[in-house]
Amino acid sequence: MPKGRRGSQNPKMSQRPAPPLYFPSLYDRGISSSPLSDFNIWKKLFVPLKAGGTPAAGVAGVAGVRSLPLAPPATVPPPPPGLGPPSERPCPPPWPSGLASIPYEPLRFFYSPPPGPEMATSALVPGSTTPWLASASHPEELCELEIRIKELELLTITGDGFDSQRYKFLKALKDEKLQGLKMSRQPGKSASCS
């Protein structure tokens, strides 16, 4: 009997508990003294079969899977699509060209063109350059100005430096753009009302 242990050895205390039946995580290594490869979840879920139809040695015992008598398979079923050797994997079909024929123009969805018959017809034709596209840059420019103004305000808050002349210039430019946008919309509304 080795030193440091008191009393007689109990056979129940010397045995380790059986591995858990749930999926082990990386932190459950203390339960068993087996190597890390025994904790591979995929080895426990999918027990590889030998050519004779019996589970591979060691894997079934570690996984706690009982080996049932299996009839020798007549033919091995093919792997699911996308699995198997790279030479046997089918290439995915190319993207159908008919699905992406609509041009991607997110601003057309969020920004309605000014009213007018020539604008309505030309806005539906893809690739046409109209004054509407020039007016669509106003919201983009306003957004860019707002972003620059917010950046300057953040620099003021963090104390990294503040350029008051640039801030005043950007504010004046933003106000000028807003006034120009309002003026371009007001004549269209007054003409449609009269």
Curated annotation (Swiss-Prot):
Residues 73-96 have a biased composition (Pro residues). Residues 1-21, 73-97 are annotated as: Disordered. Transmembrane segments: none annotated. Pfam families: DUF5529. This is Uncharacterized protein C11orf91 homolog. It comes from Mus musculus.
